[in-house]
Each structure stands twice: as structure tokens, then as C-alpha cells.
Amino acid sequence: MSEPYLKPVSAEHPVEIGRPKRVILVDESALYAESWRAVLACRYGPAVSFEFYRDPIAALDALGPDVSLLLVDLELPLFGGRKLFELAKGRGVACRRIVILSSRPAEDLHQLFPDGSCLAVINKTESNQQNAFLMILDSIVKRH
């Protein structure tokens, strides 16, 4: 018998039960990435696979429908987070699995990415935004 599957939120491709959730961060800050790597490892252990890319072009090869959560810095060098957002969708990453990160005020982010265009927009520096982000992570990791 084949592996059991659950229907993902996006309904695009099945998600294997028991497989680690694939979380990808595309950001120019290695320190920011290491802080999230530590949080994910401590909070979820082997339930999460974390990948970090500084170069958005290199990240493109890793993107596909098997991504559980894609975190994109809006202020990426080269072509920016908005462009990577569009390219990720073109590679099969569901918009409901993409979170936009920025140091801009949340109100500005919501104007650039209205409700429903992505899973969430998160200000990197506001603690209440970080708490909301942890709730999103909990939901994704514990969903299946």
C-alpha cells in the first residue's frame, strides 16, 4: 500500500503524513536566519526542515509545491521580494503558504499585499507581529 496522504490547504498537491514541514527563508541576513533556525529547532525539532537562502536566484531552484512555508524578505537584493513572491507562485508554491517579511510598518505591508494575496505580512521588528508569526508556524506544523 502506498504512503497515506492528506489534502493540503492549497488542494494543489498531497502532503505526506509524517514528513517534516519544509520551511524556506529567503533573506539577506544570516543572523536573522540563524535566530529562526534556533527557534524552529527548539520549538518543533525534527518536525520541521529549515532552509535558508541569501540569494533569491539560488532559492528559485528549491521552490515547488512541497514547500510548507516560504518566508520572503520584501527588501531582497537583486529583484526584491515582490518579484520572488510572483516567481514562487509560478513554481507551484501556494500563495497561502507565503509570508512576506519586512521592517516596514504593517500598514504599508498590507497595502502592498492585501488580505488573501499571501498567508501573512509580518514586520520583523514588532514583538506582537513575531507572536502572530509563531501562531502561524504552530498551525502549519501541527496541521497534519
Protein language model features and the residues they cover:
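As written
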Residues: 81, 112-120
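Hydrophobic/aromatic residues positioned on beta-strands within the core alpha/beta folds
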Residues: 100-102, 124
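Alpha-helical interaction/dimerization surfaces of two-component signaling modules
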Residues: 35-43, 112
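Two-component signal transduction core modules
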Residues: 70, 121-122
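Conserved phosphotransfer microenvironments
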Residues: 56, 71-89, 95, 108
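Conserved phosphotransfer cores of two-component systems
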Residues: 63-65, 89-95, 116
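Non-catalytic signal-transmission and effector/linker regions of two-component phosphorelay proteins
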Residues: 1-24, 28-38, 127-144
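Acidic, metal-coordinating helix/loop segments flanking the phosphotransfer/catalytic sites
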Residues: 37, 51-69
